[in-house]
Amino acid sequence: MQFGRTTLSKFVIENTRASHGELGALLIDVAAAVKTISAMVAKGALAGHHGALDSTNVQGEVQKKLDVLTNDAILRHCEWGGQLAGMASEEMDDPYPIPAEYPRGRYLLVFDPLDGSSNSDVNVSVGTIFSIFSRRAAGDAELGDYLRPGSEQVAAGYAIYGPSTMMVLTLGNGTHGFTLDRESGNFILTHANIRVPEDTREFAINTSNERFWEPPVQRYVSECKAGKSGVRGEDFNTRWIASMVAEVHRILIRGGIFMYPKDSKDPSKPGRLRLLYEANPMAMLIEQAGGAASTGRQRILDVVPDSLHQRAPVILGSKNEVERLARYHHEYDTGADRPFVSPLFSERSLFRDESRA
């Protein structure tokens, strides 16, 4: 307790007793890594942490100095405790085996060490995203152990490094936010049982890619942009930060819908965001807060990955808007949204008046 308030350590211990303390101990190690990363991000240019390296990750993205430093921080904080069978990261081509000198556990930790790292040089909020799975037995993990649907996650969370550092966590019993008290060094429960409003009038998408979107996404965004004069009959606000953690955090606090949909900009990629360590943990957090998360055609947490760095379309946030966009995808796929062309009466649209939908 901190001045009568619940600390992260107390919270995870109380909520992970069934794991004999192993899951709680792992989460406390993750929190320690988050504190280290928070200090790194805060020092920024003072410590020479800004700028890029002469290396790329498995996605072909140029690595920032902070990408590598934060990745190493998580490995060092979490590899030694005996809870893990292995780790995987956006910044590593292959799964990371636990060093031989440390005991093995039955958990798998997958993470994006610094989401939105391109924003670090311009002092915009960035974050860390993580997901935890459980194996049936302790020992060294194999690649197949990681290729499981997000519905099998036992915990997921993110840290956001902004005006304050927060860690948002779910153990499958709701979504909860903890704020770092820098005086005591403790994470304190400040946002218990976060709930995402079912309706929203705010959407986040990179509109520079509009020409590459599929028709259902173009339809949805067009309706939102039309505002009161359009079929929705209401005005919408648009947001885009280019940091998934910052976007999702805003949605958890005040509602909204975040879209990084499938597009044709690079036909070889079914989506932009990585399924295992970006889409899955965020989907679990959003669903546990009463929201929804979809690829447009499937619940994100039901997608079975076939590779470690698989990408997926992501649409998540306020439930009614996510379901509307999923319906638009279904109507597009079945042809229900195609206009009817009459030889006598020109063209009639089969779109319903969405102001009454």
Swiss-Prot record:
One cellular component term from this protein's GO annotations in UniProt: cytosol
Sorted keywords for this record are:
Carbohydrate metabolism, Cytoplasm, Hydrolase, Magnesium, Metal-binding
Report residues binding Mg(2+) 1.
E90, D112, L114
Biological process annotations from GO = fructose 1,6-bisphosphate metabolic process; fructose 6-phosphate metabolic process; fructose metabolic process; gluconeogenesis; sucrose biosynthetic process
Q: Which residues bind substrate?
A: D115, G116, S117, S118, N206
The enzyme's E.C. designation: 3.1.3.11
Q: In which pathway does it act?
A: Carbohydrate biosynthesis; gluconeogenesis
Q: Which Pfam families match?
A: FBPase, FBPase_C
Name its cellular compartments: Cytoplasm
Cofactor needs: Mg(2+)
The free-text cofactor remark is:
Binds 2 magnesium ions per subunit.
CDD domains xrefs: FBPase
Give the main localization category: cytoplasm
Q: What reaction gets catalysed by this protein?
A: beta-D-fructose 1,6-bisphosphate + H2O = beta-D-fructose 6-phosphate + phosphate
- InterPro entries according to UniProt: FBPase_C_dom (IPR044015), FBPase_class-1 (IPR000146), FBPase_N (IPR033391), FBPtase (IPR028343), Fructose_bisphosphatase_AS (IPR020548)
Q: Which residues bind Mg(2+) 2?
A: D112, D115, E278
One example of the protein's molecular function in GO is: fructose 1,6-bisphosphate 1-phosphatase activity
Its family? Belongs to the FBPase class 1 family.
The protein's assembly and partners:
Homotetramer.
Protein name, per record: Fructose-1,6-bisphosphatase class 1 2
